């Protein structure tokens, strides 16, 4: 079962912004879309650019290297069905963003 690991403080990621963090050795991009926090793999699959420093427009981030666009709410590519980066469960507790990396146990 994956544990939720502290990734950042909520005040570090105001609405409309993003950041890249390392969680358990994994690079993850965190986004605040209208007060909702989302986490996906930080590396753009096209050229490995950091999505955490990409341009966020609504729920879509554009990689600054080659313009690849990814929906941060689910990791999917809006213009290409079937392609996605990993997305991760997120919880915000007492102003702390926590992200689960790895498999989760199914709810019982």
Residue spans of the language-model regions?
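Binuclear metal-ion centers of metallo-dependent hydrolases, dominated by the metallo-beta-lactamase
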Residues: 81
